[in-house]
């Protein structure tokens, strides 16, 4: 898989809305037809389909030319969101002529990495329409730095290098501009949005906007073996799944990807992995293809799911944070993740399937398990497989600096991940 494809996704996916938009553009070029869940479906063998759910979640699937109800249902899921700062309504406030924007924290970012960085704004804006039940949606991306969170100088904060607690409401408020005395009472943020979108300020009804790092991905290292970028968690997985659903060669069954939102805040939303939509959607696919209720149930519960999200790599300055025998490094392939707590949904049979696929196709992989005295994180696999109880395996690219404003990966690991998911879909 070409690395340029990953770079393109990373550059475009500055919000979950833009991530889904970029994914749909990729799929449309490959012949995927868009469906709406509230309208009738007319499924055909040999076709490919996609469905946008509330703007930040995307489902896409292919129906094999030689489709059989008893062929294994193969699914893979990732997430479109990442930790960021979300702009609140009534965002404007002024501090001694500093124009500032009120924000809240989404997910679990490493907060100090967002200081002193040029930040853009991206997301969607809802605009007044003639039909009150169908307001207009406009995607917005500033495309340039419009915010910055300045650090307090060390002369005023002598203990900063010993570690200082960050107050989300005090320390994270970005600066948007310097105002004149006359401007201080104006509604400057909505005025800015209205001008950018060429709409009337009073027609802006609401918005869902987040900050993003405007710096682009960069190759790092003497031999450039590393890639530093915002949003590697989890757009590496999004890009791998898009590549695999397009390049998979399977002709006898259903291949499906789900790109969920809200993983970083627990998955429990209408567009998250805890939604019943994946289960209901798969049932509808099989019934649209003329399968009986019995055939549909058999297909659904005989399926398999790859839960694709990033893993922790061994940190060279903190080897003590990793398990003593299962500690992946950058550049040695993607990770198979497991935890007996089921924070990862992986089981031995699923690992057996995946390892055989990788061995047959000479794809590099590693094993990841947390230290026995560290709780570790979780991801969407355990949530999705609770609601849709199929065999599941958690996999992903190993990273350093996870949840930092910029994260770090080994460049060859994306190809390993994309190749593994493509083999699964072939």
Task: Give the label of every model feature segment.
Residues 1-426:
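N-terminal hydrophobic/helix-forming segments and targeting peptides
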């Amino acid at each position: 898989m070409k690395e340029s494809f990953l770079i393109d996704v990373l550059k475009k996916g500055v919000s979950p809305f833009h991530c889904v938009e970029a994914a749909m553009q990729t799929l449309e070029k490959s012949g995927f037809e868009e469906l709406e869940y509230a309208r009738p479906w007319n499924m055909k063998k040999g076709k490919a389909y996609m469905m946008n759910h509330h703007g930040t979640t995307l489902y896409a699937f292919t129906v094999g030319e030689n489709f059989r109800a008893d062929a294994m249902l193969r699914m893979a899921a990732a997430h479109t969101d990442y930790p960021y700062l979300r702009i609140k309504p009534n965002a404007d406030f002024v501090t001694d002529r500093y124009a500032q924007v009120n924000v809240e924290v989404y997910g679990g970012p490493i907060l100090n990495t967002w200081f002193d960085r040029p930040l853009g704004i991206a997301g969607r804006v809802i605009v007044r329409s003639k039909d009150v039940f169908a307001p207009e949606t406009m995607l917005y991306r500033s495309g340039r730095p419009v915010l910055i969170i300045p650090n307090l100088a060390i002369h005023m904060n002598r203990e900063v290098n010993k570690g200082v607690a960050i107050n989300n409401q005090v320390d994270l408020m970005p600066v948007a501009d310097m105002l004149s005395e006359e401007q201080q009472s104006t509604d400057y943020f909505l005025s800015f949005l209205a001008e950018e979108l060429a709409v009337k300020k009073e027609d802006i009804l609401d918005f869902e906007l987040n900050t993003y790092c405007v710096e682009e991905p960069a190759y790092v290292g003497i031999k450039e073996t590393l890639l530093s970028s915002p949003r590697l968690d989890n757009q590496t997985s999004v890009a791998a799944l898009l590549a695999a659903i397009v390049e998979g060669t399977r002709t006898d069954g259903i291949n499906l990807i789900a790109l969920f939102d809200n993983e970083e805040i627990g998955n429990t939303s209408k567009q998250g992995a805890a939604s019943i939509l994946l289960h209901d959607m798969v049932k509808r696919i099989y019934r649209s293809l003329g399968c009986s209720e019995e055939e549909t149930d058999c297909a659904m519960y005989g399926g398999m799911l790859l839960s694709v999200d990033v893993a922790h790599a061994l940190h060279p300055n903190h080897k003590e944070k990793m398990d003593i025998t299962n500690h992946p490094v950058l550049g040695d392939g993607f990770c198979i993740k497991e935890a007996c707590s089921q924070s990862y949904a992986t089981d031995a049979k699923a690992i057996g399937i995946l390892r055989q696929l990788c061995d047959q196709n000479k794809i590099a992989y590693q094993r990841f398990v947390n230290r026995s005295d560290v709780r570790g994180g979780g991801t969407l696999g355990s949530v999705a497989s609770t609601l849709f109880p199929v065999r599941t395996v958690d996999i992903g690219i190993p990273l350093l600096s996870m949840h930092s404003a910029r994260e770090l990966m080994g460049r060859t690991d994306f190809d390993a991940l994309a190749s593994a998911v493509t083999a699964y879909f072939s």
